[in-house]
């Protein structure tokens, strides 16, 4: 793993020189970042992430952070004696779990991220789907992947109806960094827990983002031998889903990546969030730290 603090000054200068063309290329562009995995729970990686986001803003890009919070939600549920349950990579969310999800995501995780970014010199503002009517949602209908005639009731898990990016754009124009919790609201003002990968993908599409970066706990998409696949098309991904290579929690992440790529996001990267500054190195150098998804 590459740690920028361990790099010699001359090598750092070369990295900065390499970064200049990318800074020019992506100046003024929106970069949507799905922040999750170890990068959210390791204090050193948290600090690295905040610094990277601030640096992207300072060099003229517009980072938008969409965060997860699975481990933190799981910890809170265990404290309450409640067992988490997943179906096809989605958390089953009853009314009691929904209260925990809202409290953990908007009241704990989001505020921690906002604080870290502000501490690193940025101006972060926390949002949920309710703020400015950002994310309207409805109850997700989950069809069984093996039996299409069967549906699973997974509670207050939301399917995005629409995204109004006005509040995000207003914050960007005023030099703020939006930090978004994946919570939506329905017609009756009910709350919905929405998969953060899906929110990041849809938001990247609506904002016409240059890149969608998905930080995760693995090197990227791996083949059955455990080797990294550096680049994939939508068709190749379909084959990996059918043969079981891609499964579980990776399914919504991959579905979101394909959706964004097909909807006009120029580049979608699933990045190894365990590597210090991996996101920054992925954007500003020729080095790759994950899998790039393209539509064809």
From Swiss-Prot:
Example of a GO biological process term = arginine biosynthetic process via ornithine
Q: Kindly list the positions annotated as binding substrate.
A: 69-70, 91, 193
* GO molecular function terms noted in the UniProt entry: acetylglutamate kinase activity; ATP binding
Enzyme Commission code: 2.7.2.8
Q: Note the Pfam families from the entry.
A: AA_kinase
The UniProt entry, under InterPro entries, shows: AceGlu_kinase-like_sf, AcgluKinase_fam, ArgB, Asp/Glu/Uridylate_kinase, Glu/AcGlu_kinase, NAGK-C
Which catalytic reaction applies to this protein?
Answer: N-acetyl-L-glutamate + ATP = N-acetyl-L-glutamyl 5-phosphate + ADP
Which SUPFAM superfamilies does the entry mention?
A: Carbamate kinase-like
The principal localisation class reads: cytoplasm
Which keywords does this Swiss-Prot/TrEMBL entry list? Amino-acid biosynthesis, Arginine biosynthesis, ATP-binding, Cytoplasm, Kinase, Nucleotide-binding, Transferase
Subcellular localization, as worded in the UniProt entry: Cytoplasm
- Biological or metabolic pathway of the protein: Amino-acid biosynthesis; L-arginine biosynthesis; N(2)-acetyl-L-ornithine from L-glutamate: step 2/4
What does UniProt give as GO cellular component?
cytoplasm
For the site labelled Transition state stabilizer, the residues are 34, 253
- CDD domains from the UniProt entry: AAK_NAGK-C
What role does it play? Catalyzes the ATP-dependent phosphorylation of N-acetyl-L-glutamate.
Q: Which family does it belong to?
A: Belongs to the acetylglutamate kinase family. ArgB subfamily.
Q: By its UniProt entry, which NCBIfam families does this protein fall under?
A: argB
- The name this protein goes by in its record: Acetylglutamate kinase
Q: What gene makes this protein? A: argB
């Amino acid at each position: 793993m590459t740690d920028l603090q361990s790099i010699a000054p001359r090598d750092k200068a070369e990295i900065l020189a390499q970064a200049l063309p990318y800074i020019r290329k992506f100046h003024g562009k929106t970069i949507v970042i799905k922040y999750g995995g170890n990068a959210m729970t390791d204090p050193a990686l948290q600090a690295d992430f905040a610094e990277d986001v601030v640096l992207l803003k300072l060099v003229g890009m517009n980072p938008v952070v969409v965060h997860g919070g699975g481990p933190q939600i799981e910890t809170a549920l265990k404290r309450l004696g409640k067992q988490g349950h997943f179906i096809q990579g989605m958390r089953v969310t009853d009314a009691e779990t929904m209260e925990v999800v809202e409290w953990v995501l908007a009241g704990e995780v989001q505020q921690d991220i906002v604080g870290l970014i502000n501490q690193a010199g940025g101006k972060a503002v926390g949002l949920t789907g309710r703020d400015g009517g950002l994310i309207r949602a409805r109850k997700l209908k989950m069809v069984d992947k093996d039996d299409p005639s069967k549906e699973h009731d997974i509670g207050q898990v939301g399917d995005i109806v629409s995204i109004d990016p006005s509040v995000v754009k207003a914050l960007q124009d005023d030099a703020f960094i939006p930090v978004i919790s994946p919570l939506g609201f329905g017609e009756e003002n009910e709350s919905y827990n929405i998969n953060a990968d899906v929110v990041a993908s849809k938001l990247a599409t609506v904002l016409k983002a240059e890149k969608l970066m998905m930080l995760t706990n693995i090197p990227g998409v791996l083949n059955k031998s455990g080797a990294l696949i550096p680049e994939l098309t939508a068709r190749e991904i379909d084959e990996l889903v059918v043969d079981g290579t891609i499964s579980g929690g990776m399914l919504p992440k991959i579905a979101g990546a394909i959706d964004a790529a097909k909807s006009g996001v120029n580049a979608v990267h699933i990045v190894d969030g365990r590597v210090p500054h991996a996101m920054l190195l992925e954007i500003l150098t020729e080095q790759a730290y994950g899998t790039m998804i393209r539509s064809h």
